[in-house]
Amino acid sequence: MAVFTTVSQDEIARWLLDFDLGEVRELRGIASGIENSNFFLTMEHEGQTRQYVLTIFERLSFTQLPYYLHLMAHLAERGIRVPAPIPARDGEILRPLKGKPATIVTRLPGASQLAPDAQHCAEVGDMLARMHLAGADYPRRQPNLRSLPWWQQTEREILPFLDAGQRALLQREIAHQAAFFASAAYASLGEGPCHCDLFRDNALFEEDASGRHRLGGFFDFYFAGNDKWLFDVAVTVNDWCIDLATGELDAERAQALLRAYHAVRPLTETEAAHWQDMLRAGALRFWVSRLWDFYLPREADMLQPHDPTHFERILRRRLDAQPANPESAPLPWI
């Protein structure tokens, strides 16, 4: 999240006249993230104060956005803890604001857990599997817009900024993934709507009366798309279950997340055989996007681009850990 488009409280108050949400009490920009303009919104209605998140979309279009917003509504209706879009009086959940698409969603309770333990990871794995199953009958379809075709397109733009070793790594890995994506094994993998960006800062935990952290929900679905479920798991493991300094997988956390996921949606032998390929794909996707954001940034208030070397390091670690015969490697959580 970030703020590319600034708005005043008065502007928001006028825009909100089309909603039954009451009066604006506070509007506060959210600094984290790099894609859209986001604000915490406090409203007072009939003596009650409620919290929302306002998002102004900087890249996604009115045509693309219904996929994401209706997916969130679909999941929320099925008991998955995600932000629910708030409709205006006319029933629409997407409206123009300062010439760009904008929406309001409920604000989930809790705070991000940036130093997760095995229990946090288990809760994430359980809910991720339930989310995949709940989304299986979602009727809209849109591919993951940051998948292989985008990596190949973006490669040409970022190569001039890389040294020889980085260029060789990027080109080799994109070629490897292109071959994997073209394989019969890849085509056979289970798929459906995926979050595709489920990092530590895109989930919230609440502390209960006993002091235990409970998962409050997932948010920021604006990179979601139809993809292989295993890719979504790999992206999640590559963030939640690593040593941030080295990129190494933490076995205890990884096993906790994967066992919890596997208990809800058992993974297949084909998924086991290509787990390493997907870990590499997940690392590559974010190395490419962070290189692009770092070297070809957009102007924005509060923009904080991420260090691309983090995912370069993770990709190299996954390559170093590649078993001699990946197809015979057992599932890492069994």
UniProtKB/Swiss-Prot annotation:
| A Pfam short name | APH
Q: Does the keyword Zinc apply?
A: no
Enzyme Commission (EC) number? 2.7.1.39
Query: Annotated pathway, please?
Result: Amino-acid biosynthesis; L-threonine biosynthesis; L-threonine from L-aspartate: step 4/5
Which molecular-function annotations from GO does this UniProt entry contain? Answer: ATP binding; homoserine kinase activity
Q: So what does this thing catalyse?
A: L-homoserine + ATP = O-phospho-L-homoserine + ADP + H(+)
Class of the enzyme per the UniProt entry, highest EC level: transferase
Query: What biological-process terms (Gene Ontology) are attached?
Result: threonine biosynthetic process
List keywords of the entry alphabetically.
Amino-acid biosynthesis, ATP-binding, Kinase, Nucleotide-binding, Threonine biosynthesis, Transferase
Family stated for the protein in its record? Belongs to the pseudomonas-type ThrB family.
Which PANTHER family does the annotation name? AMINOGLYCOSIDE PHOSPHOTRANSFERASE DOMAIN-CONTAINING PROTEIN (PTHR21064:SF6), AMINOGLYCOSIDE PHOSPHOTRANSFERASE DOMAIN-CONTAINING PROTEIN-RELATED (PTHR21064)
Q: What is this protein called?
A: Homoserine kinase
Organism expressing this protein natively: Cupriavidus taiwanensis (strain DSM 17343 / BCRC 17206 / CCUG 44338 / CIP 107171 / LMG 19424 / R1) (Ralstonia taiwanensis (strain LMG 19424))
Chain's gene name: thrB
